[in-house]
Amino acid sequence: MRIYFFIIVSIIYIFFQNFLFSNSNEIQNSNIPNKPNIFDKINDKDNLKDMILNISLYLENGGDINITDNEGNTLLMKSVSLGYYDLADYILTMSADISITNNNGENVLILSADYPYIINLLLNNIDNLDIADNEGKTALFHACEFGNLNSVKLLIKSGSDINKRDIFGKTILMYAVESENLELIKYLIEDIKVDINEKDDWGQNAIFFATKISVARYLIYKDIDYSATNSIGLKAYEVLKYNGYNNLSTYLRKLEKK
C-alpha cells in the first residue's frame, strides 16, 4: 500500500514540477521583446525623415534593400502601400528591385493602385503594367476596386490592358461597379467604351455586382441586360437578394414586371 502511495505522490510531484517549469519558460519568453527589424521603421506613426534616416543607416550597416518580410513584401512595397512618395523615391534610388512579387503575387505597382502620384513615380521604372496577382488582378483592377478614378485614368493612359480578366472572368467594369464610384463607371463606359454586357465565368454581367440603385439605374440607362440569367439560371435581382441587397433587388424585380 505504501508503495502505491509513494508512486502516486511521485507522479503528482513530477507533474507539478513540469507544469511550473513550463509556465516559468512561458513567462520568461513573454517578457522578451520581439527583436525590432527594419520593417518596423516604416509605419504610419513616425515622421518621414526618420524613416529615411533609419533605412539609410540600415543600408550603411550592410542591410539588403530587397529584404522581404514574412508576407514577401520588400521595403519598397511597404512604402508604396502606405502612400509614402518620398520614401519610395529614396528606396528606388538605392537600386531596389521592382520586379519582386509578394506571397499574394502583388508587385509594387499593384500595391500603389490607390496612390496615383506613386503610380506616376513607378511608371518610369516598370515595363509591364499588366502583371497580375494570384487572383489575376492587375494594378488596373485594383485601382477600379478602390474606385480611384485618377489611378485608373493614369494606368489606362499609360497602356494598361482594359480587356484583361481575373481568374473568375471578372472585368474592370465589374470591379468599378462594386466600388460604387459612379464617375469611374461612367468613364469606363462612355470614354473607354468597355462592353457593358460582358459576362464573367458565371455568366454574370456588371449589374450582378451593383450594390446601389443609382449605379444600377445608370447601367440600365446605358442598356445593360438586367434580365439576363447567369450560368445557374438566376437573374440579377435574385443574386442581389441572396447577397443582402434587398432594396436593389426589389427595384430590379419591379422592372422585370413592367
Please name every model-derived segment.
Residues D225-K257:
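Leucine-rich solenoid repeat scaffolds
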Residues D44-D50, K78-Y84, L111-P116, H142-N148, ...:
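Ankyrin repeat A-helix N-terminal signature
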Residues S56-G63, D89-D97, L121-N128, K153-D161, ...:
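Ankyrin repeat domain, specifically the short helix-to-loop turn at the C-terminus of the second helix
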Residues F21-N61, N70-N73, S81, E106:
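Intrinsically disordered, low-complexity regulatory segments in ankyrin-centric signaling systems
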Residues V194-L234:
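Ankyrin-repeat and related helical/solenoid repeat scaffolds used for protein-protein interactions
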Residues M1-S24:
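Classical Sec-dependent N-terminal signal peptides that target proteins to the secretory pathway
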